[in-house]
Amino acid sequence: MATRLQIRQLGFVTDIRETRLQRLLAEAIVALDIAEAELETAGRILIQRRHDAANAKIDFARKPESEMIRIWRDVCFQRLSAAETADEMARLECDDAKARLIKARNDVLRIKERGDRITDLGKVLRRAEAREKEARVEDENPGGRANILMLEGSE
């Protein structure tokens, strides 16, 4: 059986872990908000690039008689028109933002699961503390609660 000091120490450790998890959860939620904003921005960039390409405002310094060869984010865009290149670049940016968003959501879920486990541990510790208090009352009063009730009723 755990001593009172051990139970208090475990309760203190649990409180520290809950605080750390709350901080991690807050950071993960901020990262999720940032990832969502990046995804939204990437979507706006995609729309703007498609609009610009449709209006032939994007040329990427391509000479009219030559092929356009452009490497961007380790992707080689060969024999693509300016509009197709802009569309592909925007799609890649959007995919990156989606991947960051999914990672941030997974981080939030993982931290919430850890928080739930620590909260459960805290509940177990509180139950142990309550049992210890009951045992302490029983030790101080060997007759138990019935004895206390009989004494109160006789007054």
Predicted regions and their residues:
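Charge-rich amphipathic alpha-helical interaction elements
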Residues: 1-155
